[in-house]
């Protein structure tokens, strides 16, 4: 009888965790679509490149739910945002998708070994290096146009967004993990 009760409790716990995971991933995807729009309305058309609002939802998902969730948030945010708002532009969409998926994977992996701040800093640095490699390959190996996308320029323009990420993302993820009683996947 005790074994049946323990199995029932385990099933309930797994079910609750799965629901939190699905709902959390969905909400962060919606935030990944809405937040860039809010920034564009408040701060103008260059707000996305400056404040990196779409990155925020992906990074929070990685620290809260792990690699799978953050990759889903990255893909769904980019594609749905484009379909609903036309942002990012179609020319920029594949590069931004690759960039956000790189961040999702790196942060999800690093967060299993290091604290959230170290993980986030390492992700931002290594993510930019890998993104530079993607752009290099797109230009020099595959011959794709990059439409003036520059890693160095994106870092300079995105410094306010990087500061926001470092200041807010680990705190928000910590609060979510505590409130939801989750460990990432």
Predicted regions and their residues:
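Structural signal for membrane-spanning alpha-helices in multi-pass inner-membrane proteins
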Residues: 32, 36, 40, 62, ...
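Helix-adjacent hinge/juxtasegments
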Residues: 72-112
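Alpha-helical transmembrane segments of integral membrane proteins
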Residues: 19-28, 50, 54, 68-73, ...
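Hydrophobic transmembrane alpha-helices
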Residues: 2-63, 68-69, 103-111, 169, 173
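Transmembrane helix irregularities
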Residues: 64-65, 159
């Amino acid at each position: 009888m005790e074994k049946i009760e323990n199995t029932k409790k385990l099933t309930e716990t797994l079910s609750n965790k799965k629901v939190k995971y699905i709902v959390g991933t969905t909400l962060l995807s919606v935030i990944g679509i809405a937040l860039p729009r809010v920034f564009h309305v408040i701060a103008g058309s260059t707000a996305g490149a400056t404040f990196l609002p779409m990155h925020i939802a992906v990074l929070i998902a990685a620290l809260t739910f792990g690699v799978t969730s953050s990759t889903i948030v990255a893909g769904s945010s980019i594609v749905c945002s484009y379909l609903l708002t036309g942002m990012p532009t179609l020319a920029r969409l594949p590069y931004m998708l690759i960039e956000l998926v790189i961040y999702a994977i790196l942060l999800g992996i690093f967060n299993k070994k290091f604290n959230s701040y170290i993980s986030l800093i390492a992700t931002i640095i290594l993510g930019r290096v890998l993104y530079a490699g993607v752009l290099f390959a797109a230009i020099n190996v595959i011959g794709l146009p990059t439409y003036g996308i520059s890693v160095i320029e994106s870092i300079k323009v995105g410094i306010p967004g990087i500061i926001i990420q470092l200041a807010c993302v680990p705190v928000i993820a910590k609060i979510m993990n505590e409130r939801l009683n989750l460990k990432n996947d």
